[in-house]
Amino acid sequence: MHCGLLEEPDMDSTESWIERCLNESESKRFSSHSSIGNISNDENEEKENNRASKPHSTPATLQWLEENYEIAEGVCIPRSALYMHYLDFCEKLDSQPVNAASFGKIIRQQFPQLTTRRLGTRGQSKYHYYGIAVKESSQYYDVMYSKKGAAWVNETGKKEVTKQTVAYSPRSKLGTLLPDFPNVKDLNLPASLPEEKVSTFIMMYRTHCQRILDTVIRANFDEVQSFLLHFWQGMPPHMLPVLGSSTVVNIVGVCDSILYKAISGVLMPTVLQALPDSLTQVIRKFAKQLDEWLKVALHDLPENLRNIKFELSRRFSQILKRQTSLNHLCQASRTVIHSADITFQMLEDWRNVDLNSITKQTLYTMEDSREDQRRLIIQLYQEFDRLLEDQSPIEAYIEWLDSMVERCVVRVAGKRPGSLKRVAQQFLLMWSCFGTRVIRDMTLHSAPSFGSFHLIHLMFDDYVLYLLESLHCQERANELMRAMKGEGAPADTGEELMLMSSTPTSTSPAPYSPAKSVHSVGVPAVGSPNSAQSPEYTSISATTGAVQSYTWSLTYTVTTSGGSPTEPGSQLSCMRGGPALHGSSSAHRMPVYPHRDEHGYTGSYNYSSYANQHHHAIQSQYSSLTHEAGLPTPLHYSSYHRTSAQYPLNSQMSRMESCLMSGSPLLHSSPVTPRWPDVPSANSCYSSPTVHASRYSTGDMYSPLAPRRNSEYEHAQHFPGFAYINGEATTGWAK
């Protein structure tokens, strides 16, 4: 924020006090040189101090500061002007004022984040308090020192008022809903992949993604780790067979692209918006931790699913880091671009650049140098020249960069499908070479505005990279969408054979992967590039043997003898690899997820609150395992409830909590039909260790559905078709 020299305010309330001080100082100066004067300096000081009948009161001063001033980003007040306000206050209160240094300490008690800047023209600069403004209700109110804008005086004497820079907070996006996810009716599913299960998974995953988005908006980034862990490690057993399908993996990739784009738009809607330092720090921390959280949450899941999740999350983290650094460069470049003197000097240096030589050197980097490329470089040169000449704001430069990428990359790649990466590489090479040549030319000629050009060059480079990375992510999502719909290649009807087949045999269990499964040989793992291989995955070759054991980290072990058919009550044969248990044909084991206690895993992800769903006979279709006789009692743990009071995304309005639609809290008007009813069997798959109950109480995560008091719904925000989000959350953004 640039502030110029601010004149002292002309206030009638202080004129008399200033005149009296001048008269008294003049009389003291005369009397000190008079031979008649017999009053010492100590007596004069004592007389001066005794003018006020009341001693100085710091609490009264703090109260006065609170009533008349407020924190405002980008507003400057001269230190002398604020001290004059304070002296006027002391005079009206008939109290003894403190000196300017002591008053500065009192101000910092009331406004600790206040900073001091020396502003003004050379030789006439003054100290200013930066970040404080006079309230409109104050008697000292002046538009120059208010939130409506800070004023400065340029060389021509023209006063301009700048817009106040308001720090952005993602809380303004509360209630944001995700765009539509893919519809199962539009997908080209293999015949052996049940459409019903895919539809159920999309519903579950949309709810999971919506929760992550809501958590990010409320700034509770640490809860994202818990949601990831509970969703993937608490997946219902009957949904596990579909996770390794290439179609479901593509669905996850498309949905993740939608989620990441929504999060990016919520955290930083535009790179030009000023962000608080606290928000920038938590965004960078979140981008750094997301990959580690996914490694833990996706432990022992199908390899192609892990790969697509890792690939998209790392691209998303890179874009977040790019946005934060770009935002910092934009704020620094704004002060340069909005200065008339700097832009005038930049224009002069820009026109002194040897354009012909730079153009020839740039064209050397092109594969096929053509005349239209030379004309394009000259056209871009002239457009930037016009922006400098018009002293355009930074928003105009951003629009120019957007149009440049649109003309040079998007339109060219649109004529040749699948060529986006190559076209972007060629443009980036030309752009980097031209910018480097310009900076080199200015360095050799000692251009006065070299520093400003260097800053603008950094900002332009980062913004172009940000646009190209965003285009690449969108292209990747489009590829996954085409593969999901079967437009690129027909769906492999044989890849889902494992859902209905008997259990193969092997001497040692291997982690489940469709690319290595006996029934899915030759099926490629769609969306699983080698560059995004999971560090935890270790390939184990499957061999033929007498006993094959398929386990899942959160379920029980099922063992079948080689050549014998699978028992009707056994688990399906596409569980995750784990340690083999030999002995009986049906073995029971404890949940073996290794990071359960460390990450507070409860072992359950309950979707029973979702209504308007068709009921399925899950108990008869997926029989539970028999309990081992060696264990005295079954394990009983509390479920991880997710109530429709918080996320009734798929509920009818009549089944939503009545208090969301009226002022009185009531229970549900009709019972909610559970999507998957709780099976009261002795060997329930999901468990919650007692240590979790002590570390994470139920109220910390999700409160049970119960009547609530009217006081709990104050300040609540309501959104049609969605649960309320309390605007006064415990953990919020720093204002």
UniProtKB/Swiss-Prot annotation:
The protein, known as: Transcription factor RFX4
Main location: nucleus
GO function terms (MF aspect): DNA-binding transcription factor activity, RNA polymerase II-specific; RNA polymerase II cis-regulatory region sequence-specific DNA binding
Domain of life: Eukaryota
Region (Disordered): 25-59
Known role: May activate transcription by interacting directly with the X-box.
Locations listed in the record: Nucleus
Pfam families per record: BCD_RFX (PF25340), RFX_DNA_binding (PF02257)
Cellular component per GO, a single term: nucleus
InterPro entries per record: DNA-bd_RFX (IPR003150), RFX-like (IPR039779), WH-like_DNA-bd_sf (IPR036388), WH_DNA-bd_sf (IPR036390)
Entry's family note: Belongs to the RFX family.
Keywords from the named record: Activator, DNA-binding, Nucleus, Transcription, Transcription regulation
Keyword Transcription regulation: yes
Residue ranges for the DNA-binding region feature of this UniProt entry: 44-126, 61-136
PROSITE patterns reported in the protein's UniProt record: RFX_DBD (PS51526)
